[in-house]
Amino acid sequence: MVQQNALLCEDKDRFKFTIPLLHDKRLEYSFSGLKNQVRVEISKLETITQKDIADICYAFENTACEHILNKLERVFKLRNFKRFGVVGGASANLNLRKRLETLCQKNGCELLLAPLAFCSDNALMIARAGREKYLKKEFISHDKLTINPRVSFKKIEI
């Protein structure tokens, strides 16, 4: 939906969002600040038109892509890849795919992408895994679950 609306953008300079964690040396991603910037800009509008939606989606999509590429460029400086694969819902975004192709070409690396038909939201993969567990009657009591919505990965092995 973001991609389709971004393609309708008429004023590419109307909204400018800050790239999250731009100067943060960690390889972690965070889109919460970017989502908040979008929320703030939307709250400034009296009414929301299709043009507003298109212009905001364009700015959001490009800033999100810049954020991802910024982190990946750091990863590519740490390690030489022969092949680099991207999966999940974000891999369906054509803007991101184009930027990933450029990054991989620049680094002499083969980019592996699934056909668009197989690039869906990860929720489907999680649901499928849950279905398989259910069919095998592999259950766990809810009181044995540990839920941490703010889990931190201190070290990422590359």
Regions found by a protein language model. Name each.
Residues 105, 121-135, 155-158:
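Claisen-condensing/thiolase-fold acyl-transfer catalytic domains that form or cleave C-C bonds
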